[in-house]
């Protein structure tokens, strides 16, 4: 896999870890910074809930990861209603 460590800011990666057919989905959540990576498990619900384990990342980075996870969770019910898969396999975002 290519190097996901950015030269500036942070990359946030959610990778689905299991089936994607229910009202919840498990993800492996990782924050990549220029010199570190922080990983935790996450359970997202199509009611907009997002439960993340501790990442060990600075609070600001962890809070951004939680916000991204909640956005993905909130979109799940809408995607299902539109006839699309509710839980993406992989989501990658970069923030400064």
Residue positions per predicted region:
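Amphipathic, interaction-prone secondary-structure segments
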Residues: 10-39
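Residue-level signal for the start and early helices of compact helical domains
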Residues: 3-5, 33-35, 85
